[in-house]
């Protein structure tokens, strides 16, 4: 099975922008999601913070709006990224982003 697709909405808590050595523009945001979902007929609180990476020219038009406090919905795929400390973490690479506020 090769499906890897995710849609997640939430509030941006941090953001930064940079260009790679190849000149590709990147925006990196920390997305905070809070909701309630039913699981096994019980209501549970759901909370997650996850890094989202937006790469390339298609995101340049919204990059200025990706600031702390802004609500967004992100569609993309998940992958592991190795941090400077050598530990892997799950991140989302965005394929689409929609501003909600």
Curated annotation (Swiss-Prot):
PROSITE patterns: SSB (PS50935). One of its GO terms (molecular function) is single-stranded DNA binding. Keywords: DNA replication, DNA-binding, Primosome. It holds the Pfam family SSB_1. Residues 1-101 form the SSB domain. InterPro entries: NA-bd_OB-fold, Primosome_PriB/ssb, Prisomal_replication_PriB. GO terms for biological process: DNA replication, synthesis of primer. One of its GO terms (cellular component) is primosome complex. The keyword DNA-binding applies. NCBIfam families: PriB_gamma. Belongs to the PriB family. Involved in the restart of stalled replication forks, which reloads the replicative helicase on sites other than the origin of replication; the PriA-PriB pathway is the major replication restart pathway. During primosome assembly it facilitates complex formation between PriA and DnaT on DNA; stabilizes PriA on DNA. Stimulates the DNA unwinding activity of PriA helicase. Homodimer. Interacts with PriA and DnaT. Component of the replication restart primosome. Primosome assembly occurs via a 'hand-off' mechanism. PriA binds to replication forks, subsequently PriB then DnaT bind; DnaT then displaces ssDNA to generate the helicase loading substrate. This is Replication restart protein PriB. The lineage of its organism: Bacteria, Pseudomonadati, Pseudomonadota, Gammaproteobacteria, Alteromonadales. The gene is priB.
């Amino acid at each position: 099975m090769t499906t890897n697709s995710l849609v997640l909405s939430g509030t941006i808590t941090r953001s930064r922008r940079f260009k790679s050595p190849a000149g590709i523009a990147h925006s990196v945001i920390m997305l905070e999601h809070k909701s309630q979902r039913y699981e096994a007929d019980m209501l549970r609180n759901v909370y997650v913070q996850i890094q989202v990476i937006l790469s390339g020219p298609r995101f340049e038009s919204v990059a200025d709006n990706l600031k702390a406090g802004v609500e967004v919905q992100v569609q993309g795929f998940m992958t592991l990224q190795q941090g400077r400390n050598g530990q892997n973490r799950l991140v989302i690479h965005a394929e689409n982003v929609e501003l909600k506020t």
